[in-house]
Regions:
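A general sequence property marking short-to-moderate contiguous segments
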Residues: 1-22
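Surface-exposed coil/turn segments at beta-strand junctions on protein surfaces, enriched
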Residues: 24-26, 63, 73
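Short, ordered, surface-exposed loop/turn motifs in non-cytosolic proteins
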Residues: 39-53
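Structural motif
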Residues: 24-43
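Hydrophobic, membrane-inserting alpha-helical segments
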Residues: 187-246, 256-260, 290, 311
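Short Pro-Gly-centered beta-turn/loop motif in secreted/extracellular proteins
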Residues: 43, 68-80
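Short, acidic Ser/Thr/Gly-rich low-complexity loop/linker segments typical of extracellular
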Residues: 55-67
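Cationic, glycine-rich low-complexity segments
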Residues: 81-181, 213-231, 271-282, 290-335
Length: 335
């Protein structure tokens, strides 16, 4: 940047550096710095390093208004490097509270809500069900679509039992993850547990959306993902120091939280399947009753495996992030 220009630039996906230059009487210049997020909120306490044409280096810290003045800068070009906001990272939009959350719901209530077709994004599955007023009567009469009906149970249970969700698609994705893991063969594939862990991260209160966003970027780019890319994504999702946030993530705590979240869905699913088996048997539909008991057994297996498998999956995220965060240049440069 030359002394006769004042430039405003957008860098790093979220931050907005601005510089103005004033000539001093003694032939040097004063450079006024300002750094803000794209919404205009100042970046607080970020460090800066200004190097002028003569090689002189000026270091300091922006104030809480994102500003600083640097005097005595030699004529000619200069370069500025900024650090991160000194505050702890906080997402712009914390993970959303689930308005349907009802931890006291029992199996009967979940069945009744499922019969109503409360989960809107399963409407396509409902259209595949013929004639009967509710799918449960279709079950008893033998008009039963295994996949669509079981997914409906899981989706409605998740919608009832998860306190927060990143987005509505999380419930759909969680149902699909669990459906996949009902197969013994699929339970042996690490990628299926990794997919489950990614969905569940989005359901962790406050930081779930931000962590899930960076996990998706890291998984897509793998070892080739740069630190700069990862932090730019996170910087676009909140304010504060993204690198400190990622370096201090407690992945084993995330494993514990996500294990509890999915268990809170699986256990009611077991109760629902057991209740439906009892109901089918009372109606003389013994084969269907056996199907639901088998379903309950498979879900129990998943629930038992969850803690160890999610620890392994979160451990993989920990290793991947450690490799990525070991790379990269300083994030914000202005010349």
């Amino acid at each position: 940047m030359t002394m006769n220009k004042a430039n405003t630039m957008c860098l790093g996906g979220a931050q907005n550096p601005s510089v103005s230059v004033t000539e001093d009487q003694e032939g040097t210049y004063t450079v006024d710095l300002y750094l803000s997020y794209s919404d205009g909120e100042p970046v607080q306490g970020a460090t800066y390093t200004l190097t002028d044409q003569s090689g002189a280096v000026f270091e300091g810290t922006l104030d809480n208004n994102g500003k600083a003045s640097v005097g005595g800068v030699a004529p000619g070009e200069f370069a500025i490097e900024y650090g991160e906001d000194s505050r702890d990272f906080m997402p712009n939009v914390p993970t959303k509270t689930n308005p349907n959350f009802n931890p006291s719901a029992n199996a009967q209530l979940i069945i009744e809500e499922t019969k109503k077709g409360e989960v809107g994004f399963w409407e396509n599955a409902w259209t595949r069900m013929s004639g009967a007023a509710s799918w449960i009567w279709g079950v008893i009469l033998g008009d039963f679509n295994d996949d669509a009906s079981v997914e409906q149970i899981i989706a409605n249970t998740a919608l009832t039992m998860i306190p927060v969700v990143d987005q509505a698609a999380d419930v759909r994705d969680l149902s699909a993850n669990i459906m996949t893991l009902l197969s013994e063969e699929e339970r042996d594939k690490p990628e299926n547990w990794l997919a489950l862990s990614l969905t569940l991260v989005g359901c962790v209160p406050t930081f779930g959306s931000a962590v899930k966003g960076t996990c998706k970027v890291a998984l897509k780019g793998g070892k080739g993902t740069s630190k700069d890319t990862l932090l730019a994504v996170l910087r676009g999702m909140g304010k504060g120091d993204p690198e400190k946030f990622l370096r201090t993530l407690d992945w084993m705590d995330y494993a514990k939280q996500t294990s509890q979240i999915v268990s809170d869905v699986l256990k009611p699913c077991i109760e629902v399947a057991t209740e439906l088996a009892s109901y089918a048997n009372r109606m003389g539909a013994d084969e269907l009753g056996a199907y639901f008991l088998k379903l309950a057994d498979e879900v129990k297996i998943i629930d038992k495996m969850v803690p160890d498998k999610l620890k392994e999956a979160m451990g993989e995220f920990d290793k991947l992030f450690a490799r990525i965060l070991g790379k990269g240049e300083k994030l914000i440069q202005q010349k």
